[in-house]
């Protein structure tokens, strides 16, 4: 049954409900929130509705009695062969043969548009994802957010949303100062100045690479003695490793130490400090953009945190005017507990500096000021405590907090078979997204990142992702697509071609249970996309593609698509030609849906493997 026919079936039930309301069997204000679902067991029909069960309380009657009244009130429809009442009151609908094949017509008529809808046409949604600090290359954890955010964005577009993908560039604040100072200290080292590098500095080799570029460009123009930079700076943290292998602090304060180095670097360099900050920022941000672009992840907007500096004070003034700010211990606090948060939050410190939370309030107000109907934030699971305070701020500003959806994405662990891969080291090295992509390929990375619910940890098996077996779901799904392509190549090599008209005429030959199951599953694709998109659950689509590939492989292995006579150079009989064209039609439909689904997930659909 096509999506249009599903809508027709829903309309038939609405008509029956109208009759019951008119007869006084149901209250006039009763709202129909029932569901029409595809059955898994063919003996239960093609579709089932729970409408009688949902209406029973309002009708003050047994669900089966309500079901009988609904069935009796249903208008006739040529696509329906039979209707049964089952169990406690489910209404099972059996379609006639012609109606079952309507989905194949839809697939070939709509092509890449099959399954897409305009249900949310005209609504604007912003999806913000990754938004990693531009202080280092992206690691494998960021990769999951990238794959998830891009897939969700594609799915939302598939159901009609006008989607803006956004990366929030955290280019302001203390982390950028730590990066700038780390770069400057490495620059001193490249110029021969001995440096005691801070524990809290950025340790990676990429910082030294940026520093080397700056030396090439500016020689020793900005060199100062390290003693000047470290003057009056609190002692850095000193650690030892105890008998249990744990790092134990002996003395010093790494935070105070790096802050002192930052302050002295700014004072000594003056305007030159911005040179180091901007050089590091532009280099790392360019690397991030290249990495994501190579991963098939793109954005309509790269939004700079610096750009909202001027919006922070006005938004705090709004909160103050509304009575939601107060002073305590020199800090300015936001009354987030008034809106369900566990405690109030500081928005301006005693030293006059606004907090990161204050920037986030301004940023989220800015999002809705830009006219988005809905905003989706894809955050790491470690941000779970941050959600209530952001929603509290929106409520305080008079913005409907339900317009903000936050999806928390859990962490990723890498495995090689039974051995867990170390994700990082003390030297500052970590497994990057680029390294993962180069080892397993973009397709495997994109698929396995979204193949599980976002709130579930991902155990990424590197060896499995590279294997060519049915256990590797990416290979298994793509191989189904390639198999159809191979059949068409063999057909062409034999001097024959696909006859779409004959395939449509003969499709009623597809009566095997496996063929009926395939057609039924193809018909489920539009509803699958809708559910996957509205719930921000791309794993629903990966599961669907896995099921479709499995059904196809099983059918393919048990049924010949091309007649045996072709391999011996004989001309197929009329019956063989009829069955061949019918099965080619079904195969091409499967190929098209797999290609469409893989495309929404950002994966390729290879013609050979």
Swiss-Prot record:
* One Pfam family from the record: tRNA-synt_1d
What EC number(s) are associated with this protein in UniProt?
Answer: 6.1.1.19
| Signal peptide start and end residues | none
An example Gene Ontology biological process: arginyl-tRNA aminoacylation
Q: Does the keyword Ligase apply?
A: yes
Q: Where in the cell is it found?
A: Cytoplasm
- Which SUPFAM superfamilies does its entry note? Anticodon-binding domain of a subclass of class I aminoacyl-tRNA synthetases, Arginyl-tRNA synthetase (ArgRS), N-terminal 'additional' domain, Nucleotidylyl transferase
GO cellular-component term (any) = cytoplasm
Q: What class of enzyme is it?
A: ligase
Where is the motif 'HIGH' region annotated in this sequence?
132-142
Per the record, the similarity remark reads: Belongs to the class-I aminoacyl-tRNA synthetase family.
What binding partners and quaternary form does the record give?
Answer: Monomer.
User: What's the protein here called?
Assistant: Arginine--tRNA ligase
Species for this entry: Psychrobacter arcticus (strain DSM 17307 / VKM B-2377 / 273-4)
